[in-house]
């Protein structure tokens, strides 16, 4: 089979002085950072959907890309052609993982029976590709938001037949993820929210999605899946308001339904922006609450109110993110998935590489800066030890006539310190 990316053998590390746009300047997979290989710290993944499914269409224009697998033809054969190109890309980019939605890799078909048959065939194709390439599945998920039947939600839909269709997709995608050795399974409620409260029963919808998640957990244990279940927070789009608004909201939901020990979060940078938070805030909050799982590494635009899904380029932002992750012990089953897409005007097929290479270098440099912060310990925080009751603390304060003086937070000093790590050689 002829290679699609025929002008490239493989992206390799050439060092900071390289001017080759198809080489890494900072990402050296085997470089040791805090005693661990850089590849093992970062656990990079490329996503199927933006990279191979999006045809360049937007709200104001038709598809701008000329991808061979997006032309008219027999659906399964085109899906297999897409898989050929995808794994060629993963191998040449040198990423250890990939991620997918069910209908990214397989034709949906005209019925649930067709959906399951098509997906089963494509899972076999993907398994062979993984075996051949050594690329592994970071996580799988089900697309329960694109089909018109999910217009009023999937797990929150008031129609039990729609709810059942969503359950079918999720159980099938979970089984596929398990078979392919996936390390996580993601649940993103793209339409689990509302457009107006005039036709929405908030209590019922919350109870429905709570029960749905409980069933997902039950199925995980029944099938023996050892990976991590992840919810991906997002405040809005496509709905006006989504129930998984941000990390703190998801934690409250998990606590309500007794799931806080079973499900963690997959945090996307652009979703943090839409929620009015920094990416740093969402990561730190998840770690503090004990539900940090994985990351969708991208960036949004603070001036725009929608998901732009651009590649990350800010070392300043991501060094602080990687600092939080390193302090917490690093990833376990999670990783850095690039939920990002080239711009509509980027029609050259090698633009896919340019976007990912820049993003991987950004995260690699961020990791190295974060490691220096951890090693130096200047940004370390005191760890509370021991336990005292509120009454004993009050008694202590009275006996010792405490009159503490306000201590400076030194924000400016700390910001300057971060800049030293970022910009000093």
Swiss-Prot record:
Residues annotated as binding Mg(2+) 1: 232, 268, 296, 339
Cofactor(s) needed by this chain: Mg(2+)
Cellular component terms (Gene Ontology): cytoplasm
Swiss-Prot/TrEMBL keywords: Carbohydrate metabolism, Cytoplasm, Isomerase, Magnesium, Metal-binding, Xylose metabolism
NCBIfam families noted in UniProt: PRK05474.1, xylose_isom_A
Known partners and oligomeric status: Homotetramer.
Annotated protein name in UniProt: Xylose isomerase
């Amino acid at each position: 089979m002829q290679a699609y990316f025929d002008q490239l053998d493989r992206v390799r590390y050439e060092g900071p002085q390289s001017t080759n746009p198809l080489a890494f300047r900072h990402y050296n997979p085997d470089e040791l950072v805090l005693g661990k290989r850089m590849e093992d710290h970062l656990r990079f993944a490329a996503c199927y959907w933006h990279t191979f499914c999006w045809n360049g269409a937007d709200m104001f224009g038709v598809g701008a890309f000329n991808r061979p697998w997006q032309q008219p033809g027999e659906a399964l054969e085109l899906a297999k052609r897409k898989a050929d190109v995808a794994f060629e890309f993963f191998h040449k980019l040198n990423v250890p993982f990939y991620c997918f939605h069910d209908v990214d890799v397989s034709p949906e078909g005209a019925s649930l029976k067709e959906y399951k048959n098509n997906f089963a065939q494509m899972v076999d194709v993907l398994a062979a590709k993984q075996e051949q390439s050594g690329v592994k599945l970071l996580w799988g998920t089900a697309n329960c938001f694109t089909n018109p039947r999910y217009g009023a939600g999937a797990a929150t839909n008031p129609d039990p037949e729609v709810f059942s269709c969503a359950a079918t997709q999720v159980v099938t995608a979970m089984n596929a993820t398990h078979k392919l050795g996936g390390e996580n399974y993601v649940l993103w409620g793209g339409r689990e929210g509302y457009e107006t409260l005039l036709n929405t029963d908030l209590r019922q919808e919350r109870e429905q999605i709570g029960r749905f998640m409980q069933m997902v957990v039950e199925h995980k244990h029944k099938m023996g899946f050892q990976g991590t279940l992840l919810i991906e927070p997002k405040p809005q789009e496509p709905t006006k308001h989504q129930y998984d608004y941000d990390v703190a909201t998801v934690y409250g939901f998990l606590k309500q339904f007794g799931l806080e020990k079973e499900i963690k979060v997959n945090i996307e940078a652009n979703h943090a922006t839409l929620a009015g938070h920094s990416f740093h805030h969402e990561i730190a909050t998840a770690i503090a609450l004990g539900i940090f799982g994985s990351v969708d590494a991208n960036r949004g635009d603070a001036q725009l109110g929608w998901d732009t899904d651009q590649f990350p380029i800010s070392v300043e932002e991501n060094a602080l993110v990687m600092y939080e992750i390193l302090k917490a012990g690093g990833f376990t089953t999670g990783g850095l998935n690039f939920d990002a897409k080239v711009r509509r005007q980027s029609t050259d097929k090698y633009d896919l590489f340019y976007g990912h290479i820049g993003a991987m270098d950004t995260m690699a440099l961020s990791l190295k800066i974060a490691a220096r912060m951890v090693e130096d310990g200047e940004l370390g925080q005191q760890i509370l030890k021991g336990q005292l009751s509120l009454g004993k603390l009050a008694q202590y304060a009275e006996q010792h006539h405490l009159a503490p003086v306000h201590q400076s937070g030194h924000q400016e000093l700390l910001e300057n310190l971060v800049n030293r790590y970022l910009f000093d050689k």
